Amino acid sequence: MSRLYYEVKISAENQEQANLILNSLLQKKLVTGGQFLKAPARFLWKGKITDMDYVTILSYTNDQHKDAVMDDVRKTTQEEVPMMTFTLPDDINKELRDWIDATLS
């Protein structure tokens, strides 16, 4: 059976939270690392439009670790609604697959 590889996006309300989340995942070897993408954000939250700066962690994992990533983020984040998405790329190059496997083993 082929392994599935995911591009992971995880939200954080600020850089401090993003660091805590990513460090926890890295210590457990659940993701390969991460880029921090900072941008202003706007949400409809509890009936009100809310503006804030947000950090998105962009990383990679595989199907073996997907559930553990979700569990760990839920334990680490301070967000009331943690936002995590796991996207299956249409294609992923061999070098990236090999690096993900080596990093997470």
Language-model features, listed with the residues they occupy:
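Positively charged, small/polar-rich N-terminal and surface patches that mediate targeting and assembly
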Residues: 1-105
